[in-house]
Amino acid sequence: MIKTVDLKKTFTGRGQTVYAVDGVTAHIKPSEVVVIIGPSGSGKSTYLRCLNGLETLTSGQIIIDGVDLSVKKTDLNLVRREVGMVFQQFNLFPHKSVLENIILAQQVVRKRKREEAEEKARMLLQKVGIPEKEDEYPIRLSGGQQQRVAIARALAMDPKVMLFDEPTSALDPEMVGEVLEVMKQLAREGMTMVVVTHEMGFAREVADRVLFMDQGKLVEEGTPEHFFTSPQEERTKLFLRQVL
């Protein structure tokens, strides 16, 4: 489904070159839930953004559903149609209702008729647990509700894979659970998911594999049971002692 080979992403400034992602090779299979953890600045979010073409890779290879993003002639917009992404910030249109937020991309990108787009939006609002909010505006919603709208909006495009970039980090603690529950349901339904998060409980419970990154490198990976109980690398052990 997703494969990266020796993926590197550099940023240059003040005469220095920084490797935000430094030679990451990984393979994510269909219906697999992969959780990426690591300290701040480890390259987790940059790696995720490379998968959706939001960051241009410096070198290496990204293949999503058979399409090679490292080939310059690749139409990234076609790839993005198949890859949903949910960010830390909800990025909803403040001047549009919840329903309109979910309908817009369906009509513009998927070319769906209004009636079909509305039906899809209402079904997804039911799925994420806020069907009664379709006429509300984002400012009237809690952070957890806004993030659930953002998830519904991404799902409305019928993606083959969902990317989550720290989806709960901007939420008040009591709202984290409602968003994680929606993500757990997606995992149970077989959605291919790559999740950058600090929620270790979610990683233990839902992930098929956990990837640990530090200083742009993939340091260690394994099943949750193996990763959390028998980590092999000293850097992994130190990180887990600090967060668990």
Regions found by a protein language model. Name each.
Residues 1-224:
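ABC family nucleotide-binding domain
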